[in-house]
Amino acid sequence: MLQTAPVTGLKLIGSAAPGFYSDLFDRLLPVTRSITGPGLRESLDIFGEYMPLRRDRVVSGTAVFDWTVPPEWALTRAILTGPDGEVIADSDRSNLQVVNYAMPVDVDLALEDLQPHLHSIPDQPDLIPYVTAYYRDSWGFCLTHTARQALKPGRYRAVIQSRKYDGGVDFADCHLPGDLDREIMLSSYLCHPSLANNELSGPLVLLGLFDRISRWKRRRFSYRFVLAPETIGSLCYLFRHGDQLRANLAAGLVLTCL
């Protein structure tokens, strides 16, 4: 039987310390993540403080099955101001207020021309929606429906300082060996900013499971933990490691919306 050794060289996961996961949640929540880019890498860096992550990427333009890896996206700031100079939306206030993957823009336009670029939820008037433009050239702002209904006629200025460029999709995994080469794979996606249930709940539970399983003195199965952006990240992981998974995978579980 394989005697497993504890993982060393990492920060201790404070599974017994009050507030550890809530503090880590607070650290991760405001990072401007997307399916590519610096926010994704920053988030992987943070998880890499507690897990021995093996990092990988597939570069922009690569054909991955019937998908193509998109350009990277990076946001500096997005701000929408109203007729009197008042701030209507500001990514520094909430990174949900800009359409994720929005193209750069600096325009002055009337309210009626701005409306097609605004997003809100009429039946949840006090919530800011999360909207993406991953695979198209588009731009927009997200705000509560209450705030949208209060907009007055006049000229508005929309400024989005962003860029798309050749880069890649980043992802990571780590492996805990067991008696068998057969693997249990646990995966979660890491790409949405400022969302709890449909984002950080999965990666944080994955980290907790890694912590617990890494402490087992003996494991029958090997365990693989995967963090990747939704859809394109999973496809890139399969593109890289599909043969290995076909040979060794016994079971898999996607952790999301927990």
Model segments located where?
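N-terminal hydrophobic/helix-forming segments and targeting peptides
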Residues: 1-258
